[in-house]
Amino acid sequence: MKTLIHNDWQTVLEPVFESPEYAQLHAFLKEEYATKTIYPEMHHIFQAFEWTPFHDVKVVILGQDPYHNPRQAVGASFAVAPGVALPPSLQNIYKELQSDLGYPPVHHGYLKAWADQGVLLLNAVLTVQAGEAYSHQNHGWEELTDAAIAALSARGGVVFILWGNAAKKKAAVIDTSKNAIIASAHPSPLSASRGFFGSRPFSRTNAALEKMGEAPINWQLPETVKAD
């Protein structure tokens, strides 16, 4: 079995990687990357898992699929590379972070400081065709990310932040007896005013972590960063 993720996620997801469904997904992606512009770059597909090993995960921020404009997607939900303009959803996340905890927005969207503390920045679908949102839905990614969420849920002690209807569907595979769910509208400009703003996800996540005996996340991002 080829190593796709260089930490304990490889073992956790091995049954998926060895499944016929993943073989079909792999064949689909091989053709897509050969003939179209696909984001993120192939070596960044599993970046969220690389940044935050399974045994370190305390929080999951679940997105839908990667950004589909040039230079944006880095393989981690809502994050962009240093030097890339902040997408509107991330601008709204920063506004809510300031409203919730008082941290002023930083001028980059590189969220690795969160990932380093145990925040898994996971999209439900890990690839997308340029300019075509949701174009890689229903090709097999959902089974892999469901398996990742189910494994974390079984381990327990995780706060799942579910923004928007697609993310909320993942609640079906989360055991709420030993994990916490914080759900609201999506931070996109289309829906942020319908329940995302004012939802205080950051302080509520830290309260849930402390209730489970875990250390809180320092949500304040550094002003200067460089990409790994």
Curated annotation (Swiss-Prot):
Gene Ontology biological process: base-excision repair, AP site formation via deaminated base removal
Primary location group: cytoplasm
Catalytic activity: Hydrolyzes single-stranded DNA or mismatched double-stranded DNA and polynucleotides, releasing free uracil
InterPro entries: UDG_fam1, Ura-DNA_Glyclase_AS, Uracil-DNA_glycosylase-like, Uracil-DNA_glycosylase-like_sf
Domain of life: Bacteria
Assigned keywords, A-Z: Cytoplasm, DNA damage, DNA repair, Hydrolase
CDD domains (alphabetical): UDG-F1-like (cd10027)
GO molecular function: uracil DNA N-glycosylase activity
Pfam families: UDG
Gene Ontology annotations for the cellular component aspect, listed alphabetically: cytoplasm
Enzyme active site: D65 (proton acceptor)
SMART domains in UniProt: UDG, UreE_C
EC class of the enzyme, as a word: hydrolase
Xref: PANTHER family: URACIL-DNA GLYCOSYLASE (PTHR11264:SF0)
Name of the protein described by the UniProt record: Uracil-DNA glycosylase
Species of provenance: Lacticaseibacillus paracasei (strain ATCC 334 / BCRC 17002 / CCUG 31169 / CIP 107868 / KCTC 3260 / NRRL B-441) (Lactobacillus paracasei)
